[in-house]
Amino acid sequence: MTALNHTPLNAAHRALNARMVDFGGWDMPVNYGSQIEEHEAVRTDAGMFDVSHMCVVDFTGSRVRAFFEHAIANNVGKLKTPGKALYSCLLNPQGGVIDDLIVYYFTEDFFRVVVNAGTAEKDIAWFNQLNEQGGYGLTIAPRRDFAIVAVQGPNAREKVWTTVPAARAATSELKPFNAARVAGTPFGELTVARTGYTGEDGFEVIVPAVHVEALWTALQQNGVRPCGLGARDTLRLEAGMNLYGQDMDETVSPLDAGLAWTVDLSAPRDFVGRDALERDGTRAAFVGLILQKENGKAGGVLRAHQKVVTPHGEGEITSGTFSPSMQESIAFARVPAAVHVGDTIHVQIRDKQLPARVVKLPFVRNGKVLAA
């Protein structure tokens, strides 16, 4: 049996009596007691997540922009100011999603990328292959000397500034999807990004791994609640945010995963997967579902891989959960393209087909329920 990878915060999680699980080969906290309370902390105050299993990768070289113009489906031409971030899919030549990632632009010869934990080695091998094939001459460096803490919620930024006063001046004017580098902190040089995976405001803080436990402890002392993967999943699902490996993978086009907005076909770029996307187009709709109640009660919970039955053919739930914010069973589903918002479809739950309403994503954003 292969030993699990540990983040630099593993001992801190165990000291807090976290319930630990194997998450893609990493020993990670699923909760620290009450998943519901952790979820609510992020929606109403501030919570923090150890996301150090994700991998920071630095790209340096004079042709780094040209490399990303070819490597990813979104357009790095949008990255003009230092610290600007871009969410994109990394595609294979067949148009399938190798990973979803965030690219940060700092200078014309330095970009930084954060990739998912379970795909990191595959991604880096693919980046190296593209670099070599295209003769870009980049240095591609995985930075396992960094850890990442995501601090999320309406009070998250203020609590980060209380904990790291030097970050206030550098990040108080930061717009969403921008990052700043903050030097001179007790926790080393930080990269603080106004990004997240919860549908709330907040920061994702890249910190030297040797200092992350001190940062985590200081944030907790300033009222930021530790949160596990359980709350992270309910929060991201409410926020309409995809999970790689569930909602899309190498067999699924971003156009069939609700990610058409991350694909830029307008610019004349020869990016990997473009030909396949233009040839195949959109073949399925990616929608939100809310399970209907009978006599005030839902007949089950929507879960991944449940069959969806529509007048236009069958589909499948890709992610599902009980929403603490809505008190409803919610899901993402890939369904025939003729299915539209407002339709009622049916989900196979055990031996029953239960009605569910098709809604526009997201379900919840900034503490407000949007789907009805």
Curated annotation (Swiss-Prot):
Enzyme kind, highest EC tier: transferase
Subunit structure: The glycine cleavage system is composed of four proteins: P, T, L and H.
Function: The glycine cleavage system catalyzes the degradation of glycine.
Family listed: Belongs to the GcvT family.
Pfam hit, one: GCV_T
Keyword Transferase included in the entry's annotation: yes
A single GO cellular-component term on record: glycine cleavage complex
Protein name: Aminomethyltransferase
Keyword Ubl conjugation: no
UniProt KW keywords: Aminotransferase, Transferase
Any GO BP annotation: glycine decarboxylation via glycine cleavage system
HAMAP family, sorted: GcvT (MF_00259)
Gene: gcvT
Catalytic activity annotation: N(6)-[(R)-S(8)-aminomethyldihydrolipoyl]-L-lysyl-[protein] + (6S)-5,6,7,8-tetrahydrofolate = N(6)-[(R)-dihydrolipoyl]-L-lysyl-[protein] + (6R)-5,10-methylene-5,6,7,8-tetrahydrofolate + NH4(+)
Domain of life: Bacteria
Molecular function terms from GO: aminomethyltransferase activity; transaminase activity
Organism of origin: Burkholderia ambifaria (strain MC40-6)
InterPro entries documented for this protein: GCS_T, GCS_T_bac, GCST_C, GCV_T_N, GcvT/YgfZ/DmdA, GcvT/YgfZ_C, TrmE/GcvT_dom1
Lineage, opening ranks: Bacteria, Pseudomonadati, Pseudomonadota, Betaproteobacteria, Burkholderiales
E.C. no: 2.1.2.10
